[in-house]
């Protein structure tokens, strides 16, 4: 068994900075040549500490950025113009992709459509809410104002 230090996240093995033991062939033929790991040395322990400190700083910065974006999203209603009939029923439904595009068009930053959760199908004009998971610890509620247009 070879003791190595991961420099990148490897699925099923660990995150960057973790010290793990793997079979010699896996380390020698896959992890080391691709730069996913370094052989473990006492000097490598210092490198592990610097990798972990950098990861913690990145995580802290991403949480702060997500909280700032959540505050901005929660405070500003987003207007969605969709095709609708005279009675107010939509031709189709509002999808997460539509919400993400409307948020970006409103100048509130870009969000991934896969992070948008619409609790119920939106099939008529009116005011609704949608949830956005910006980070695993941070989410925001967006006020949607669906109006007939186009």
Swiss-Prot record:
HAMAP family: Ribosomal_bL9 (MF_00503)
Transmembrane segments: none
Keyword Chloroplast: no
Gene Ontology annotations for the cellular component aspect, listed alphabetically: ribonucleoprotein complex; ribosome
Gene assigned in the entry: rplI
GO biological process, one term: translation
An example Gene Ontology molecular-function term: rRNA binding
Keywords of the record: Ribonucleoprotein, Ribosomal protein, RNA-binding, rRNA-binding
Role of this protein: Binds to the 23S rRNA.
Family label: Belongs to the bacterial ribosomal protein bL9 family.
Annotated protein name in UniProt: Large ribosomal subunit protein bL9
SUPFAM superfamilies registered for this protein in UniProt: L9 N-domain-like, Ribosomal protein L9 C-domain
Domain of life: Bacteria
